[in-house]
Amino acid sequence: MTEVTGPPSAAQPLFIMAMDQRDSFGTLFGVQGQPTGEQLAAMRSAKQLIFAGAQRASGMPLSGGRLGVLVDEQLGADVARLVREAGFELAMPVEASGTQQLTFEYGDDFPAHIEAFDPDWVKALVRFNPADPAGLRTAQTATLKRLNDYAVSSRRRWMLELLVPATRAQLAACEDQALYDELARPALTVQVIHELSDAGVDPGIWKLEGYETTEGARLVLDAVKSAGPPESACIVLGRNAPQHQVDHWLDIAAPLEGYVGFAVGRSNWRQPLIDYLAGHADRDETEARISEHYRHFVRTYLRADSAPPGEEESRSEPFGYTHPRLTPDREATIRKACAGADPRGTLLPAWMPQSLLAEVDALREEG
């Protein structure tokens, strides 16, 4: 693997095997409430299995890239202690698992837990929509600012995993998740980035959901570059999506200057682990499958990253484009649902796929 000489970049992208899930991980082991000692042991063993799968990819050609692991202390402390010795960068979460509002897993003691493992990256996950109640947004921003201040004072690098789930009104206006993801989420993400940056929250890396179009990805990337320090960058998260969907997101992101890798977890290991726990595969077979999924996404990213300039434009249409016809009335409904979350006017139609713009314009002329 490439020797680490600084933060990830286009020349040295970072490919993270994410396995920091805790509450959702427990559902695979039948956990209800607090896990038993037997369940804890099984989950910790499973995290070691996932890491073993990641290690099998360590000898693959990376074209300057580097590998990383994102793992939690609760279930993955043994893995965390082995990561850097194996040649991977270590990222660890600070947020409590399974909460809608961001809180620190270890409360005021979070710095001590970070320092005990000394990770290359500290990670926080937040769910944040500009249309959320003001009190919730203020509280979450304050928590992130506290982490940001700690990172600055201790000279630690940190990444923010930002999820922008639709409000009920936004989802109702879009009528389905696919339309929300394509036509509303990128612009709402821009608003979150500016709101957080204005409050002094400036992670080194924004860990973001994938975007269906080049226009959407560029919109968000431009916000990251304009709102925060110029060296800020983005990586793509996997969202437990099927392989073809993650491939599409990587195809969109990799050619764009400012995207510097990915952090994909369940799309690599969830189904192999389910099969292993059901007795349909042994440990060696499971490690091999996890490794191959991980390698696949690395190859996909590197192939897209090396595409000739301008080729990414051909990827603007989303994979499996099936959402309903966007009429002017629906456009107006989406705008209304997102009103107040879009003071900079970045919502539709400025970055919409050109095919949809032409369709809407034609309908306007007819009307």
Q: What are these model-predicted stretches?
A:
Residues 160, 235, 261-263:
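Short hydrophobic alpha-helical runs that function as membrane-insertion/retention elements
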Residues 236-244:
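Glycine-rich beta-to-alpha transition loops that act as phosphate-gripper elements at the mouths
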